[in-house]
Amino acid sequence: MSLGRLGLVQAGQPSKQCPTCPTLAEMTADATATAADIMAGKTAYVRGEKLTGTLVPITKIDVAEEGIKFSYSTFEEVPEVFDFSNVTDLSYIFDTCKSLISLPSNLNWGKMTNVVAAFRGTKSLNDEVNIEPLDVPSLEGIFQRSNISKILNLSVQSAYTAFNAFESSKLTEIGNIDLPDIVTATYAFSNIPIVHFPKINIPKIANCSFIFYNNQSMQSLAYWDFSNVTVATNMFKGCSALSSIGDIIFLHTALSLADSPNIDEDTLRRFGGFANAAGESGVAPLKSLGLPAAALTFNTAAQTYLETEGIIAKLTDENWTVNFANSM
């Protein structure tokens, strides 16, 4: 008897991105069994067929061997009967488990090869993120729309994208984030309630469009390295409370802060300082370095200060177009 689809997967709309998840056609409407039921030999579901009678008690179920995905399950904690020691593919494994409050204790992050959307939609998850080492190609949607509020440590090698990684999560506190190979992070930290976003290591980032989109509570960004950034469309769209960017590293592409009327003078002055090479603090002198012209857009509240301090003149001399608007 295959245990690949035990009734611990609740009947419901499976993830359309998860080809291995059971479909409604494969499950009866009440296809929900508990680990206690299984251990007591009461009821189980295999490929949607209800089995009753006495089952041989199971001490452990190998999640990897049985190919089990728990998407849409309703339990708060993963029953101990499930053994995760051989799991390498976490993709979609707890997708939309809305009642799950904690992660399995025996996850071996060093063995994982796929974590796409692993904990997406876990709206009750109370655990702190403490993940290292992790070597995967993508962090796409790993904690998207989850209840995660704190990252202690997130250290990931090889990952190219962090698309939607923490989008619409409850993230308010970030410790160490080391993402040395991430190139695109669209919406990665968008629509979160964080107030102060610390310095993170993400040196190869090229596309940070919408990365902080709609972070209405975010007041400060400690540091951002633009050395390799080629696209920053709507990076700060909806960041109405943003007042400070602690360090701007080699900005040389178009950027808008039109949605941020409270940018402080220290931050505005940083746009008047030039950086002649990647890794240096300041804005690139585009003309002097032979780089393409680009535009900077500020909220109209900053116009008087930038004019008075001569920052607009400095920027336009170096092929920057300076615009002002009340919103993006």
Enumerate the language-model features and the residues they cover.
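Negatively charged
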Residues: 2-5, 10-328
